[in-house]
Amino acid sequence: MNLPRALVATATVALALSACGSGTDSGDGDTVQVTTSFYPLEYAIEEVGGEHVEVTNLTKTGAEPHDLELTPRQILEVSEADQLVYLKQFQPSVDDAAEEAGDAAFDVSSAARLDIAAEEHEHEGHDHEEGEGGDHAGHDHGSQDPHFWLDPTRYADVADAIAERLAEDDPDHAADYRANAKDFRSTLTGLDKELKTGLSDCRQTDLVTGHAAFAYFADRYGFHQESVSGLSPGAQPSPSAMADLIDHIKEEEITTVYAETLVPQDLAETLARDAGAEVAVLDPIEGITEESEGEDYLEVMRSNLAAVQKGQDCS
């Protein structure tokens, strides 16, 4: 990649100072060096690339991916990678790096079919205050929900696109990439069937979530999303919006408000307490932490299934 010389020079000096005597290995030269911007892309690359890729994830374990700011070391990692796989408008600092990376950057947005507006799944009249965390440090996802991986069928389409991109850069292993993507699609198809079956008959179809990350999940499995914080996890709903949502929860006899793992649960807990509901965890799987109900995407999705079955009173 060809990032600005000043940035790379700064990153090189910082990395040299921090790595003196560490014996850091930069790869064996026989694998495709792929940098991903957050966990679901890392997981897909690992599944599709297998032994032929070496993956570095820019969003570290336990970090909220929306908040990512690239360090000098990460800028250098991006500049040295064969590919940068990212989702445009999800992480502004990565967008900046991708612009400089040119042809080495691969945006999965088209393959993900980001065509559902999060607002269509928010509670009517649910506005949010500006201020600390209100605009989430200026992050702008546009009107579409970026969390495509919560619909396994869209995730499979992205995996296919990743396979084709890897095949283009590493034609010697093209057959392996395509075979791995086919296997991954089969796994995701099975997961989708589990979700369809498990969520086919639920008494409550209003899904009250921490932030509007579940538009694709809701659309795929027959729910209507009501978000506390909109698309940005740090946004603060106005008092009137909170009161409106509390009234809605009571009127519709909603029993569960879903919190997340990577952001504070205060708002969800307050909402649930004031509305007489319980709090459960519904993980948007933006990253895996010690608090995650599973060690990888598949396990956490199945934990989500169990949580929603209980919270939405599914039979």
Stretches found by the model and what they are:
Residues 2-11, 16-315:
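Extracytoplasmic metal-acquisition and chelation regions
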